[in-house]
Amino acid sequence: MLDASISPVVLVILDGWGYRNATEGNAIRTAETPIMDALWEAYPSTLIHTSGKDVGLPDGQMGNSEVGHLNLGAGRIVPQELVRITDAVEDGSILENPALLQACSAVRQHGSKLHLIGLCSDGGVHAHLDHLGGLLKLAAAQGIQDVYIHAITDGRDTNPTEGVNCITKIERLIATAGVGQIVTICGRYFAMDRDRRWDRVRKAYELLTIDGEGCGQTATEVLQETYAKGVSDEFVEPTRLAPGAIAPGDGVIFFNFRPDRARQLTYAFVEAEFEGFERDLIQPLTFVTFTQYDANLNVPVAFEPQNLTNILGEVVANHGLRQFRTAETEKYPHVTYFFNGGIEEPFPGEDRELIPSPMVATYDRAPKMSAQAVTDAAIAAIDKGIYSLVVINYANPDMVGHTGKMGATVEAIETVDRCLGRLVSAINRAGGTALITADHGNAEYMWDENGEPWTAHTTNLVPFIVVEGERRKLPGFGTEIPLREDGRLSDIAPTILQLLGLPQPVEMTGRSMIEPAAYEVKQGRTPVKVGV
């Protein structure tokens, strides 16, 4: 029989599983979810905040997976890069940023071109048009006239055809700054892959590096023609609009602030031993990234990472306890790199297992994704009886929800619900406790008030459930565990530390979701059994 000290606390992150009462357009309410429904009714449950100022974003800004996992792991509200960079644009300090000035200096030295690459979107998840506006003002202030914009269209964190409005906004930014020209346009499907689908990235890279006269159309015309074919912004074919390829001596600023979908294209430009596809390394090239995409990349970084200390994984490791993280490819960086505050290397005693995501064009074609295998990995880790903390992410609600396909998203939700039943049974067998939550909303809002597909995240609250185990009980509580009703993601790490009996460090400013006990234990509590 396993010792009680190694009955685990298991954090289950249902990525994109938001709460919304209305059934219309709600894949979660439409789906059959007997396990989640039973857990919600049988165990202490509440709703928590995952957006805006509650996670370090501007008020009203939807959350995302990176932000969510940062807050989950840090146990404090983490000021996000979106806010940091927007502040720099608004207070003018972006005009004095050393890394950005380095790119401008190289362009002046070589009499060359400045290229601005990034997601042209107001979604605020990977980039923001306000930041592009700041870069155009910087170029103008530095006297650089040859400024070429390589626009990556969104359609995933925004409405599927919002790109045409974003192009109009860029044209206004260009007019205001007096410099800049959109020379290429490309959907994020190609330029921002993160699953090593190098055939996609190669198309984007070749668009940026092989010159030509262009297609004779404006960006707006290309998008309108794309929409007429029933294709959204995410899948816009890489298209050259005008001359202006990246060449030796040029300067490049990649203005995405979120690393995970900017890495692969960056590797193609800067790695000498790049193996994704054949290409000649462009040298010299001053390539600046807005944030640190990879600690091993030797490139100037405009906004260096924040140093987060005494985060959850670190505290667990410092007390000599072992932990396990697992997710499929699409969310693996989130339960590792982002959950650990932007640190790539695991902490001592932290084991990880990556489950490959299915190789399909879009996940509506495989809505089950790799949820079964992720569940198997988590159960195997729990059964070992050596881990005090297990963190698991189910990608399906978010990744399939992003496709805008209702039927597929319902299947994704039902798949996760079945897996959750198996997982909770394993946790109960081990005497552990499960904390079930989500990092942001998505699948609960599949189309807008006009009946158009909604493929972005939401600002809706998400569930939080404590499935208390037989050997991970909280001392001082009776038959019920009272939960706070004003919680946020940063409160979950302190809750985990309380369950593990570990002290909360002063840097961790979140508050446990569990209200102080009002009475003494009067009877035993046995986990409620749910069907699997």
Swiss-Prot record:
EC number annotated for this UniProt entry: 5.4.2.12
PANTHER family: 2,3-BISPHOSPHOGLYCERATE-INDEPENDENT PHOSPHOGLYCERATE MUTASE
Active site: 65 (phosphoserine intermediate)
Taxonomic classification: Bacteria, Bacillati, Cyanobacteriota, Cyanophyceae, Synechococcales
SUPFAM superfamilies to which the protein is assigned, alphabetical: 2,3-Bisphosphoglycerate-independent phosphoglycerate mutase, substrate-binding domain (SSF64158), Alkaline phosphatase-like (SSF53649)
GO molecular function: manganese ion binding; phosphoglycerate mutase activity
Binding partners and assembly: Monomer.
Protein name: 2,3-bisphosphoglycerate-independent phosphoglycerate mutase
